Amino acid sequence: MKKLTLLLVIILAGLMAFAQDVKTYQYVQRDTLELKLDFYTPSQVTDSTICVVYIFGGGFIMGNRDGEFEKAYFKQLVDEGFQVAAIDYRLGLKGVKNLSITNSQPLEDAIYMATEDAISAIAFLLEHSKELKVNKDYIVMVGSSAGAITSLQTDYALCNGFLNSNILPADFRLAGVVSYAGAIYSREGKVKYRNHEPAPTMFYHGTADKLVPYKQIKFFKIGFFGADALVKRFEKFGYPYYARRFEGYGHSVAAGGPVTVDDLVWFCRHYVLKKEHLQVDGFYRNLDPRTMPAFDMYTPGDLYK
């Protein structure tokens, strides 16, 4: 019993020490809404420290930047030497019902709002880079589900001059994007990166995802393009990527961050720091979908009703 008590004290002390390393900032105000970010710092920061901008998931209807799941993940990242900026963003699908390909305007609006907020958060980090010791050349976006959509969409906007991307320096480039079950929304048909190539991107996606398409959904030129469709574009144009496809899995892959930290470290070492131009693709078929939680097979109808 004494050993267990001591262990709990050690764990609690560790979490308290971790909490003391976070500072909260308001990065932008939208009307009366104050959007904030929590900034976590490792014990040592160097010129090669990577800053992860994390975008939480929740279908653009729920979620927050400082949930227990998120904070545990951030501790893993900080322990690996990453800075973490966990941001708020506007949840544009709250109250929306009957979302579909023929009723996609609410989704478009929500994605664009979240993307504008993410770009504003990056602008804040750049403006305060000296104070926060952020290297502007090593900013990597990581997102889950709606956050993954936002992360991919942010890089898409920066590469094409969309939305409020002009608030960032013209030479700014994301160092990487990591998407856990994300997609890109386009009104122009297939995804195109016109002004410069996209950041090296790590894709995680379940092949049976019914909430965010693994392949694509198209209605004339309006489309929602998941990992499979995006990898084909990256492959065609020679863009660097790292894809992990989970055969038979649905949307639960969105929660894969904490169990893939080693992958993230490898990706950042090779794609971000060493700038290796790699294209890595892998299927994972020896997995049992029956072990997945109920939300693994969620559809839009389960969230927007």
Map each language-model feature to its residues.
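C-terminal catalytic histidine-bearing segment of alpha/beta-hydrolase fold enzymes
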Residues: 232-305
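Alpha/beta-hydrolase active-site loop
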Residues: 105-131, 226
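The feature captures the conserved acid-bearing segment of alpha/beta-hydrolase catalytic domains
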Residues: 165-237
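N-terminal cap/lid segment of alpha/beta-hydrolase-fold proteins
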Residues: 19-48
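Primarily recognizes the serine-hydrolase "nucleophile elbow" in alpha/beta-hydrolase
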Residues: 123-197
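Short beta-strand element of the alpha/beta-hydrolase
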Residues: 48-59
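Bacterial Sec-dependent N-terminal signal peptides
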Residues: 1-22
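Short amphipathic alpha-helix adjacent to the substrate-entry channel of hydrolases
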Residues: 65-87, 94
